[in-house]
Amino acid sequence: MKIKYFMFVLFVWCLLVNGSSYCIAEEKKKGETVVHGVMIVTMDAPLRATIGRKVNVEVIIGNERATKVTTILTVTCPTTKQQIGREAETLDGLSSQKIVYSWNTEGLKEGTYVIRAEVEKVPGETDVNDNVRQLEIALVR
């Protein structure tokens, strides 16, 4: 009975998180344990910005483990091959931290630019789908 209850709770949790029952079937199929680590919780920047002004890119990273971890956060603009920021971050267990970088748009042309944030996986981490986020910013005059 306990296993059925656990599967039901897992199903409901997956449904709430993913909007479908996909994860239960996927976990059964894999037959391996998912090991969480670090993640990009949110990433925020204006959808539109003026060329020549600095644009703040806010990233919240999280630690899904109960123990302290250190990872490297890198924020880039793949469109221009610019590195906006990169630094090591140490997070206490089950915690998050906000990091804000300033992107210099001086000399860029009008258009849409991709901004990408990535945290390096920590030892033993197998769930890396949440380690990367990106967004687009339209630069105008």
Regions picked out by a protein language model, each given a short descriptive name:
Residues 9-18:
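Bacterial N-terminal signal peptides
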Residues 1-5:
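Positively charged n-region of N-terminal signal peptides that target proteins for export
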Residues 23-141:
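Extracellular/luminal regions of secreted and cell-surface proteins that mediate adhesion/ECM remodeling
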